[in-house]
Amino acid sequence: MKRKVLLMGRSESGKTSMRSIIFANYIARDTMRLGVTIDVEHSHVRFLGNLVLNLWDCGGQEGFLESYLTTQRDHIFRNVEVLIYVFDIESREHQKDIKNYKSCIEAISQNSKDAKIFCLIHKMDLVPEDQRDTLFKNKEQEIRQASLPLKPTCFRTSIWDETLYKAWSSIVYSLIPNVKVLEYNLDKFCKICEADEVVLFEKATFLVISHSARKVHKDVHRFEKISTIIKQFFLSCSKSQANFQAMEVRNSNFAAFIDAFTSNTYIMVIMSDPTIESSATLLNIQVAKSHFEKFINSTSN
């Protein structure tokens, strides 16, 4: 099953850098050597086994954008499942950026009226921390106004923290069919294990696919932080030619289990009940693997 995803925005807004971090295992500092995208770069990213993201990374130079909106209009904007538009927060051509975005929205409305729209307000690490909330809200309001009658989902992002994983996890989640069936079964598993939380990660990208929680946690970005940390750990393992299989982290307050789950996922189980032995949790994970394999395969077919 293929899903066409457009990645658009002005030149040097950070589109190719974020794609390389999420899908090609780059670390943030290595993206500095990436060149400028010329015209359209196509990549096919296999996700959850049978789901293929047909990612069109569109160069943002003015000449290319004009071509996308005229001679290539139908070719670029037809059969699109998701449009990801990246705004560079430091751009000095603010009005032109909004005008170009509105032109893309018009083309999407005409050629792929059911496409989902995600706007990433990028390079937020360059904004003083005490100004980020206000700046993001103002930018989001302006983007929503420019998008009417479509309703975009906006995220603040940076390649230097977990916000990039938060945004892309949400984007990929929107592309997974029958994901509610998976969530229902994950809820049941969480209750059976008497876990505080259970999180499912895609194996190649370590993006969050789904999660279930029985206890409220104040840090809403915790999963994305874990994605970032574990992916860095995976890269370290691969450099030393070691294969990651499982991990258990325990202190006086909780135990966290991260284990290879199905052929395309990892699972994380968080436990705080001291009366439940590690062996019981590990057995539950082992027993659930074959059960979840069929649900995850069905969601990507």
From Swiss-Prot:
Binding residues annotated for GTP, in chain numbering: 9-16, 57-61, 122-125
InterPro entries in alphabetical order: Gtr1_RagA, P-loop_NTPase, RagA/B, Small_GTP-bd
UniProt KW keywords: Cytoplasm, GTP-binding, Lysosome, Nucleotide-binding, Nucleus
GO CC, any one term: Gtr1-Gtr2 GTPase complex
Gene Ontology MF terms: GTP binding; GTPase activity
Keyword GTP-binding: yes
UniProt key word Nucleotide-binding: yes
GO biological process, one term: positive regulation of TORC1 signaling
One Pfam entry name: Gtr1_RagA
Cellular compartments annotated: Cytoplasm; Nucleus; Lysosome
NCBIfam families found in the cross-reference section: small_GTP
Family membership noted in the UniProt record: Belongs to the GTR/RAG GTP-binding protein family.
Job description of the protein: Guanine nucleotide-binding protein that plays a crucial role in the cellular response to amino acid availability through regulation of the TOR signaling cascade.
Full protein name: Ras-related GTP-binding protein A
Top-level taxonomy: Eukaryota, Amoebozoa, Evosea, Eumycetozoa, Dictyostelia
The encoding gene: ragA
